[in-house]
Amino acid sequence: ERLKAKLYAGMAMHGITEEVADEIYARIQAFASFGFAESHAISFALLVYASSWLKLHYPGAFLAGLLRAQPMGFYSPQSLVADARRHGVEVRRPDIAVSGVDADLEQLAVVEGLGAGESGAAVIAPGGMDSCRAADQPKVERFRRGSPDRSAEHRRDGGAAVRLGLTSVNGIGRTLAERIVAERERQPYADMNDVVRRAGLTVAQTEALATAGAFDTFGLSRRQALWNAGYVDSLDTLPGTAVDAAPPELPGMSDVELTLADLWATKISPGEHPISHLRGALEEQGIRPVGSLGEPDDTRRVRVAGLVTHRQRPGTAGGVTFLNLEDETGMLNIVCSEPMWKRYRRIGRQSNGLVIRGRVEYADGVTNLVADRFDPLAAVLPQSAATVARSTSRDFH
């Protein structure tokens, strides 16, 4: 409306008046009612298509880019890594000998544990299909949960793994990470004490790197590295006063302990999803993996278990609350009616690990679970308490 007079004046200068001018204005006005939303939809669709193409063909590079851009977006680094791992991307822990400041790609031939400063054979076989680069593509088939995953056929960076950066470690900021990398490029680190001395680490920073497995490259287990963290020279000790004490024979960490250590140090478990360690016990109780649900389960009542990644209650949803539940097989949308949420609100909000009972809804390739009961995962499986305590969620955003 603010431009109406100016528009009519301009049209009059070009001989467009009366009914013709009114018709042009009416059409512009009608388009304005949805043109803003349409332009946003088109620009967003382009971003979605480009992102989807990259995720399919270069999932390793796509993951590394997302990790470099943190904090951002809907999904946590843990969920991003878990999804990439399910699609065949190898994710490696921080390594003081090879990690950069941020997450990056490295050749699969660079094997962990080679020793500080060493590198493996650098050979990357070409991957993917040339037809993927053609402008004209066949129609995409309808998605069905549980159908064979053929994404590996399209992957073009299959010879690369994602290496977590040093900034992913708790307490290691960008300035310190840059100093660690700069010192390493000047001269490879000889041992753990050399890293601490040259990079100027505190005991807390050394312990965080040890917990993350960053010193594994020196042939140390995580417990040995943690023991050594209290003896090496650091900013917390007087120069030359550290005791050169060999660590005692310490038992290695179990797979569960390694996962918990990863989560504490980086909030990411690159090896295994935390719920995978509980799968046997869950199956004994008839609790199914979320990735096993699909069209054949439509309307069935089932129980699933996992870690809550999101809680949302949109103002336009009529009181319905939505949760995302994740286990080692994938994510599941949980739909909670207003009465159900009121009944289980305390458990639903306070427990990051849940066992959820409900009925499956399957439509257009999307599986939802309409929940009718919550139980804390730690109450059903007490051994899960430490895992649940390490998990976090993003709520009501």
Predicted regions span which residues?
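Noncatalytic, beta-rich nucleic-acid-contacting surfaces in large DNA/RNA-processing enzymes
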Residues: 1-397
